[in-house]
């Protein structure tokens, strides 16, 4: 039987796997009555720029759950090493005409669709840019010092110079701005498959940050500075932080 394909040009993909070492079954973790993946999906389908939003998984439990709440879900190989590889397989198999694709982490239940729209518009308005990702300024000392939050420095043209789990730049003056990286990436098709074809690189392995692989191979990543900064779910204990955030922002659409 021939596999279904879609004609969408701009696609949002939410990679979701069951076997997280830090939090097994994380996509189905409940947050105030809805699963993590459902909250993320329902935020992103409000996008004004994407033609299609899908969850990409290798687990039948996740697929069944997404279909149950009315979402779109596609099955991928369990061999994918990370979310970007899962998105690349999804695009290659199901979206042969996609020109812009956005990798949206399924652990961002409070991520607003406006962040995704800003990335897509950046690519639409600047044909020379191949890949773009959001950053948000922070003054929170815990966020700056913890290795669970990734920091980014970039040049005056908005091109990323480096990403690190360490505080960068080193702060000699209080007014030095620090930017947190938000784990969402918008690619042009050629940039996505160029990344997939590249070999793992020393700094990406040292920091455990796949985006450094792009920089080490001579590619470029532009940043889009956004106001929206919200908690993600990496560990089970993060659920209570997200619930508190949602309760405090109950007037917003989540």
UniProtKB/Swiss-Prot annotation:
Broad enzyme group: transferase
One Pfam family named in its UniProt record: CTP_transf_3
EC number(s) stated in the UniProt entry for this protein: 2.7.7.38
Keyword Nucleotidyltransferase found: yes
Catalytic activity: 3-deoxy-alpha-D-manno-oct-2-ulosonate + CTP = CMP-3-deoxy-beta-D-manno-octulosonate + diphosphate
InterPro entries listed in its UniProt record: Cytidylyl_trans (IPR003329), KdsB (IPR004528), Nucleotide-diphossugar_trans (IPR029044)
One Gene Ontology cellular component: cytosol
GO molecular function terms attached to this record: 3-deoxy-manno-octulosonate cytidylyltransferase activity
GO biological process, alphabetically ordered: CMP-keto-3-deoxy-D-manno-octulosonic acid biosynthetic process; lipopolysaccharide biosynthetic process
Localisation: Cytoplasm
Biochemical pathway: Nucleotide-sugar biosynthesis; CMP-3-deoxy-D-manno-octulosonate biosynthesis; CMP-3-deoxy-D-manno-octulosonate from 3-deoxy-D-manno-octulosonate and CTP: step 1/1; Bacterial outer membrane biogenesis; lipopolysaccharide biosynthesis
UniProt keyword list: Cytoplasm, Lipopolysaccharide biosynthesis, Nucleotidyltransferase, Transferase
Similarity remark: Belongs to the KdsB family.
Role summary: Activates KDO (a required 8-carbon sugar) for incorporation into bacterial lipopolysaccharide in Gram-negative bacteria.
Name assigned to this protein: 3-deoxy-manno-octulosonate cytidylyltransferase
Lineage: Bacteria, Pseudomonadati, Chlamydiota, Chlamydiia, Chlamydiales
């Amino acid at each position: 039987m021939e596999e279904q394909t879609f004609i969408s040009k701009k696609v949002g993909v939410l990679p979701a796997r069951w076997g997280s070492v830090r939090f097994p079954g994380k996509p189905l973790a409940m947050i105030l009555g809805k699963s993590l993946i459902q909250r993320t999906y329902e935020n992103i389908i409000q996008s004004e720029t994407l033609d299609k939003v899908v969850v990409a998984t290798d687990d039948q439990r996740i697929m069944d759950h997404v279909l149950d709440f009315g979402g779109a879900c596609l099955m991928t190989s369990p061999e994918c090493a990370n979310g970007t590889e899962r998105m690349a397989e999804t695009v290659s198999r199901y979206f042969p005409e996609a020109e812009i694709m956005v990798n949206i982490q399924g652990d961002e239940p409070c991520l607003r669709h406006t962040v995704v729209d800003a990335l897509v518009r950046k690519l639409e308005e600047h044909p020379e840019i191949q890949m773009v990702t959001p950053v948000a300024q922070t003054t929170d000392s815990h966020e700056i010092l913890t290795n669970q939050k990734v920091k980014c420095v970039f040049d005056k043209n908005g091109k990323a110079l480096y990403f690190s789990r360490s505080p960068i730049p080193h702060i000699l003056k209080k007014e030095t701005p620090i930017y947190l990286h938000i784990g969402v990436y918008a690619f042009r098709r050629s940039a996505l498959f160029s990344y997939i074809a590249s070999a793992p690189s020393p700094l990406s392995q040292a920091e455990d940050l796949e985006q450094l692989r792009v920089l080490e191979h001579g590619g470029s990543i532009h940043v889009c500075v956004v106001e929206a900064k919200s908690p993600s779910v990496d560990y089970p204990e993060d659920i209570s932080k997200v619930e508190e955030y949602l309760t405090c922002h109950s007037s917003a659409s989540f």
